Regions:
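Acidic/polar alpha-helix N-cap and adjacent early helical turns
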Residues: 278-289
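Gly/Ser/Thr-rich phosphate-binding loop
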Residues: 12-17, 26-97, 110, 117, ...
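Conserved beta-loop-beta connector loops within the AMP-binding
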Residues: 104-132, 151-152, 169-170, 232-236, ...
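Conserved ATP-dependent adenylate/AMP-binding module captured primarily in the ANL superfamily
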Residues: 1-13
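Conserved ANL (AMP-binding/adenylate-forming) active-site segment centered on the GW(Y/F)…HTG consensus within
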Residues: 62, 94-99, 124, 138-162, ...
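AMP-binding/adenylate-forming catalytic core of the ANL superfamily
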Residues: 8, 15, 135, 140-141, ...
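Active-site glycine-centered loops adjacent to acidic/histidine catalytic or metal-binding residues
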Residues: 46, 70, 103, 163, ...
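Beta-strand->loop->alpha-helix junctions that form or flank phosphate-binding loops
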Residues: 66-73, 103-105, 210-214
């Protein structure tokens, strides 16, 4: 049976999973024009949840969305978007904005962000750097693997997560990207996650990913790889028109490739490693721009 049918028949009230799972379920909910009966809460982690998905699930279907972040090394949850009592005073759009964050740290979890120079960065909601965590439920090394332990831990005992994040004064953490997925264009950073989430809001895009591709002038430029709904035909101009008021102009992807499906890992995440290998020799048509 489909996931929709399974949840409907079993009267599932709450469910946990990665965004790829929920995007597929949401597509079926649109077709059925309803949600699975009794379904009222979902927790999503593993990768960033698109704003458009949160808005639609909450506004159109009445499903409460909670965003989370974690790692196996954190046992596994590190943060969730529990809004607290102050949420009563927030508008719907303000609540959605907070839910695009990966949330506030769990009890006993400490978080900090560190710049490329190794210095601590302020929790001002603007500065971003590598997210590092420490706590009673977080590893201090890998069993019988000293080399991996040394690479993963700082000298003062913090775990290097490999995620790039910013943290607000109120303690809300938002992932900017994985360190290996950031795009450095002309010396400036572009977040593949932010660009993906913006593009994901297009009504004809079912799923998408952004990777860097070589550019002779800028070093790297974003390449959007997308799956469309019901074989809808789009082009780069359509994508730019949609994204123009959502991201900086220099963030706009230099090209878009449409595919039948994206590769996924065993846990349902989009496999950017596979995409990078597949498009490693990609050349932009207008690379002189």
């Amino acid at each position: 049976p489909s996931l929709f049918s399974l949840m409907d028949n079993e009267r599932v009230k709450a469910a946990w999973g990665v965004p790829t799972i929920w995007l597929g379920l949401l597509a079926e909910m649109r077709k059925q024009k309803r949600k699975p009966q009794d379904f009222s809460f979902m927790l999503s982690g593993g990768s960033a949840v698109p704003r458009s998905m949160i808005q639609e699930l909450e506004k159109e279907f009445g499903v409460d969305v909670t965003h989370g972040w974690g790692m196996t090394e954190c046992s596994p949850v590190g943060s969730t978007t529990t809004l607290g009592s102050q949420a009563k005073e927030l508008s719907f759009d303000e609540k959605v904005e907070l839910k695009t964050y990966q949330g506030r740290r769990m009890y006993t979890v400490d978080m900090r962000i560190v710049g490329e120079d190794g210095k601590l960065l302020p929790h001002d909601g603007k500065a971003f750097g590598e997210l590092q965590v420490k706590g009673h439920a977080i590893i201090d090394g890998y069993h019988e693997d000293e080399e991996a332990s040394v690479a993963a831990m700082t000298e003062d005992g913090w775990l290097k997560t490999g995620d790039v994040a910013r943290i607000t004064p109120e303690g809300f953490m938002m992932l900017v990207d994985r360190t290996k997925d950031l795009i450095k264009s002309g010396g400036e950073w572009i977040s593949s996650i932010d660009l993906e989430n913006a593009a994901q809001g297009h009504p004809s895009i079912m799923e998408c990913a952004v990777i860097s591709a070589y550019h002779p002038q800028w070093g790297e430029r974003p390449l959007l790889i997308a799956v469309t709904e019901n074989d809808v035909t789009l082009n780069l101009e359509d994508i730019h028109e949609y994204l123009n008021d959502k991201v900086a102009k220099w963030w706009l992807p230099d090209d878009v490739v449409f595919v039948e499906e994206l590769p996924h890992t065993a846990t349902g995440k989009i496999s950017k490693m596979t995409l990078r290998e597949q498009f490693k020799d990609y050349k932009f048509e207008h690379s002189e721009s």
